[in-house]
């Protein structure tokens, strides 16, 4: 199931390509376009911290990262995280898109592509773990039909030292089928 999950995906001009070393410099430029956003992320992809975070993302166990492309242009990143074969679950996270494509429906298309694929290969549950302060991302997953299950209090310490409360959102396969 998880071998089939981490596949390159596409829908017209939207493509998810397995993130690789060859994407480093293009992604560095994309992430630098919104340096103010990184304090609400667990790790920073700002210019000062980019290389360490990129190395962790592409080399980390339990992480299946993608470069997000709009045509031939790299516009962001996302990943499958926390695969749990016994629960047939996965998290979608580490998502960032360039400010130019926010508010255009691109992120909704991206998430729907990932969700459709995950459920097609046998995943039963998809989670989104979002910093409570990140209202934009919470609104986006609510719009997809996800359910907020609660808040994991003091769940992690971010790169800034902030003790983060994490909103836990989920979507089940049978819920998605009913919405599609």
Give the label of every model feature segment.
Residues 48-89, 93, 99-100:
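Acetyl-CoA-dependent GNAT
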Residues 98-104, 133:
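Active-site acidic-Proline motif in GNAT/NAT acetyltransferases
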